Amino acid sequence: MKQIETKKAAGMVLCHDITQIIRGVTKDARFRKGHIVTEEDIPVLLSLGKDHLYVWEAGENMLHENDAAEILCRACQNAGMSRSEVKEGKIELSAEHDGLFKIDKERLLRINSLGQMMIASRHGNTPVKKGDKLAGTRIIPLVIEKEKMEPVEQIANEGPIMSLLSYQTKKAAVITTGNEVYFGRIKDTFTPVIEEKLKEYGANITEHIVLPDDHTQVTRAVLKALEHGAQMVLCTGGMSVDPDDQTPLAIKNTGAEIISYGAPVLPGAMFLLAYYGKDRIPIMGLPGCVMYSQKTIFDLILPRVMADDPITARELASLGEGGFCLGCEVCTYPNCGFGKGW
């Protein structure tokens, strides 16, 4: 830091805020710390009584916070993301369309472990709407050594650590099982709930079949739905451990790869996820809670399925932390802790 005549300050970086006071109008910073002085600024600074300024001594090996923020932004920004103008060394990213926000946690941790810089984001695997804020970046000091930003540039060269996956239009088949529905003892109130949730992501039910508790019929129905071009199959009913509940066996007998039967999520513990064939078409067994609980495991899984984002058994297991829905009177999901473990 050094003192310099204001008339010679063009191109220099301010070390402190410069306050402008106009009685009855304003008392606020006219120029912020970190501002790069321009020729046009000099008359204004002089009118504020600033004949001398404290400025940073620029060095060839130093980067201003705005320049460093650009490097951090490049490490983050991907297709479908808009960025703000750099302001006081900070850049924010926002979603240009609805989609599934993804983040490479390992590379994010690498950057934030370097010191003197930070990237803060919303949770990954979160559905977002157009215009939602995604992340912000900045360095901590006003200037930083260029060599400290080199690891960030290397990470950026590997590709952005964030992505925004678009939802795909999908055709869904719903297979309702249960003697009580098949024989007309009760009304099917499950399918309308599924239909509403699918509409939110642009999916349509193109086939709906009601079957008794017979695993062979359910297996045949799943395979036929796949032959008809279903891009996901949702099986409702028959997912618990009662003798009449045969849906898990029916899905297994299709030859699909069972990723998990059961998940550490409440509501939703009896959920089943499988993928069929080389196209990895998702088949799901939905527990009864999906019908009556406001948010369940289905609300965590569906955005990823709609974005063609494969789910592993390990990821499902990681949902245990944060997998307990508190059933708040006013639901704020996804802006809450539910389902943020993966």
Name each region found by the language model.
Residues 1-88:
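Short, low-complexity N-terminal leaders and the immediately following helix N-cap/first helix
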Residues 7-11, 29, 83-86, 126-128, ...:
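Solvent-exposed alpha-helices and their adjacent loops that cap or buttress functional pockets
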Residues 29, 85, 100-119, 126-129, ...:
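C-terminal terminal segments
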Residues 32, 38, 123, 127-130, ...:
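Residue-level recognition of short, solvent-exposed, well-ordered loop/turn junctions
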Residues 55-56, 81-86, 144-146, 204-208, ...:
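Flexible, glycine/charged-enriched surface loops at secondary-structure junctions
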Residues 59-167:
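Extended, charged alpha/beta regions that create polyanion-binding interfaces
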Residues 158-213, 217:
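Glycine-rich phosphate/diphosphate-binding loop of Rossmann-like nucleotide-binding domains
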Residues 179, 206-339:
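Short glycine/threonine-rich loop/turn motifs
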